[in-house]
């Protein structure tokens, strides 16, 4: 840590941060000679989605070259070229390595990530105001969490989830359009469909 501080003091490493109105940091950058080597959210995790536009704006304004933590800036590299995940040609498909955290971002719809054919990580869009899952990646190798939204359909959900699929605390009355394959737990508790099934099971036991 001591040698790291010396590099900062000597200007060899520059540290920048995106802060809220109370001065609390939510995104931290490490830059060396105009090249961005780190972009971290809290606890060294991927930054929250709501900060992505600000992150991309800072990188563009400062003209930093993105060397590491590419996915944390919502970019990715393909065939040596850098692409913006929010502005990717829709006639192409790609894979994305890393988790995507869109939770608690005041979203009413997902950014269109439907051309992500495989996400090597987990996808979290919980705690928003989503009424649809349109725009979801096609396959998730980790977990998929869309709980605590206002979903009344699972239309647009990934075709395959290798981890768990959590759609609890929504307004689902049917489970049509759910992923074709869920390899782990499928949690749809605290939805009207769960209550309907409970009542139906009670009726079946009485007959």
Task: List each language-model region with its residue ranges.
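Catalytic-core elements of nucleic-acid end-processing and repair enzymes
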Residues: 1-95
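Leucine-rich repeat
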Residues: 116-117, 139, 160, 181
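Canonical leucine-rich repeat
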Residues: 85-88, 110-113, 133-136, 154-157, ...
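Structural alpha-beta junctions
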Residues: 56-67, 120, 183-185, 203-207
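Leucine-rich solenoid repeat scaffolds
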Residues: 164-207
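Extracellular beta-strand solenoid repeats
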Residues: 101, 118-120, 124, 134, ...
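LRR N-terminal entry segment and analogous cap-like coil->beta motifs
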Residues: 82-125, 140-141, 146
């Amino acid at each position: 840590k001591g040698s790291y501080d010396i590099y900062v003091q000597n200007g060899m490493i520059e540290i920048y941060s995106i802060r809220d109105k109370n001065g609390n940091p939510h995104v931290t950058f490490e830059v060396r000679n105009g090249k961005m080597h780190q972009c971290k959210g809290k606890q060294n995790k991927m930054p929250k989605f709501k900060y992505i536009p600000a992150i991309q704006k800072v990188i563009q304004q400062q003209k930093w070259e993105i060397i590491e933590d590419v996915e944390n800036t919502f970019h990715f590299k393909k065939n040596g070229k850098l692409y913006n995940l929010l502005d990717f040609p829709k006639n192409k498909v790609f894979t994305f390595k890393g988790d995507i955290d869109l939770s608690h971002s005041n979203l009413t719809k997902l950014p269109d990530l439907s051309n992500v054919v495989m996400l090597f990580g987990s996808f979290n869009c919980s705690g928003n105001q989503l009424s649809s899952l349109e725009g979801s990646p096609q396959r998730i190798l980790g977990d998929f969490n869309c709980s605590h939204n206002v979903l009344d359909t699972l239309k647009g959900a990934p075709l395959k989830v290798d981890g768990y699929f959590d759609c609890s605390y929504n307004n689902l009355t049917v489970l049509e359009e759910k992923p074709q394959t869920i390899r782990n737990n499928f949690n749809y508790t605290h939805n009207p469909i769960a209550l309907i099934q409970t009542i139906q099971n009670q009726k079946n036991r009485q007959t």
